[in-house]
Amino acid sequence: MGSFSLLHWLVVLVIVLLVFGTKRLANGAKDIGSAIKEFKKSLREDDKPTDQLGSTSQSTASGPQQDHGKH
Protein backbone atom coordinates (compact mmCIF):
# COMPACT_ATOMS: atom_id res chain seq x y z
CA MET A 1 0.00 0.00 0.00
CA GLY A 2 2.93 2.35 0.63
CA SER A 3 4.53 2.03 -2.81
CA PHE A 4 2.93 2.95 -6.10
CA SER A 5 2.40 0.32 -8.76
CA LEU A 6 2.67 0.80 -12.49
CA LEU A 7 -1.09 1.32 -12.71
CA HIS A 8 -0.92 4.23 -10.25
CA TRP A 9 1.82 5.94 -12.29
CA LEU A 10 -0.17 5.49 -15.52
CA VAL A 11 -3.23 7.10 -13.94
CA VAL A 12 -1.09 10.02 -12.74
CA LEU A 13 0.41 10.38 -16.24
CA VAL A 14 -3.03 10.45 -17.87
CA ILE A 15 -4.26 13.09 -15.42
CA VAL A 16 -1.17 15.25 -16.03
CA LEU A 17 -1.66 14.94 -19.80
CA LEU A 18 -5.30 15.95 -19.48
CA VAL A 19 -4.50 18.94 -17.28
CA PHE A 20 -1.48 20.32 -19.14
CA GLY A 21 -1.79 18.85 -22.63
CA THR A 22 0.92 17.22 -24.69
CA LYS A 23 2.11 20.42 -26.38
CA ARG A 24 2.70 22.22 -23.11
CA LEU A 25 4.56 19.24 -21.62
CA ALA A 26 6.71 18.89 -24.75
CA ASN A 27 7.63 22.58 -24.63
CA GLY A 28 8.46 22.31 -20.94
CA ALA A 29 10.69 19.29 -21.52
CA LYS A 30 12.41 21.08 -24.40
CA ASP A 31 13.03 24.15 -22.23
CA ILE A 32 14.50 22.02 -19.44
CA GLY A 33 16.77 20.25 -21.94
CA SER A 34 18.07 23.51 -23.39
CA ALA A 35 18.63 24.92 -19.91
CA ILE A 36 20.72 21.88 -18.98
CA LYS A 37 22.74 22.25 -22.21
CA GLU A 38 23.42 25.93 -21.49
CA PHE A 39 24.44 25.12 -17.93
CA LYS A 40 26.92 22.45 -19.07
CA LYS A 41 28.25 24.80 -21.77
CA SER A 42 28.85 27.56 -19.23
CA LEU A 43 30.69 25.12 -16.97
CA ARG A 44 33.01 24.15 -19.83
CA GLU A 45 33.59 27.82 -20.73
CA ASP A 46 34.40 28.68 -17.11
CA ASP A 47 37.17 26.07 -17.08
CA LYS A 48 38.87 27.42 -20.22
CA PRO A 49 39.48 31.03 -19.07
CA THR A 50 40.93 29.79 -15.78
CA ASP A 51 43.59 27.83 -17.65
CA GLN A 52 44.28 30.74 -19.98
CA LEU A 53 44.52 33.20 -17.09
CA GLY A 54 47.06 31.02 -15.35
CA SER A 55 49.32 30.82 -18.41
CA THR A 56 49.07 34.55 -19.22
CA SER A 57 49.72 35.60 -15.64
CA GLN A 58 52.89 33.52 -15.56
CA SER A 59 54.15 34.98 -18.84
CA THR A 60 53.40 38.56 -17.78
CA ALA A 61 55.03 38.00 -14.41
CA SER A 62 58.24 36.83 -16.03
CA GLY A 63 58.17 39.61 -18.67
CA PRO A 64 58.71 42.65 -16.40
CA GLN A 65 61.45 40.91 -14.42
CA GLN A 66 63.56 40.54 -17.55
CA ASP A 67 62.96 44.17 -18.58
CA HIS A 68 64.13 45.54 -15.20
CA GLY A 69 67.44 43.72 -15.48
CA LYS A 70 68.25 45.25 -18.90
CA HIS A 71 67.82 48.90 -17.87
From Swiss-Prot:
Coiled-coil residues: none
The keyword Cell membrane is annotated on this UniProt entry: yes
GO cellular component, one term: TAT protein transport complex
Region Disordered: start-end pairs: 43-71
Membrane topology annotation: Single-pass membrane protein
Any GO molecular function: protein transmembrane transporter activity
GO BP annotations listed: protein transport by the Tat complex
Localization in the cell: Cell inner membrane
Compositionally biased spans, kind Polar residues: 52-65
Cysteine disulfide partners in this protein: none
Superkingdom assignment: Bacteria
Family statement: Belongs to the TatA/E family.
Oligomeric form and interacting partners: The Tat system comprises two distinct complexes: a TatABC complex, containing multiple copies of TatA, TatB and TatC subunits, and a separate TatA complex, containing only TatA subunits. Substrates initially bind to the TatABC complex, which probably triggers association of the separate TatA complex to form the active translocon.
Protein known as: Sec-independent protein translocase protein TatA
Source taxonomy: Bacteria, Pseudomonadati, Pseudomonadota, Gammaproteobacteria, Lysobacterales
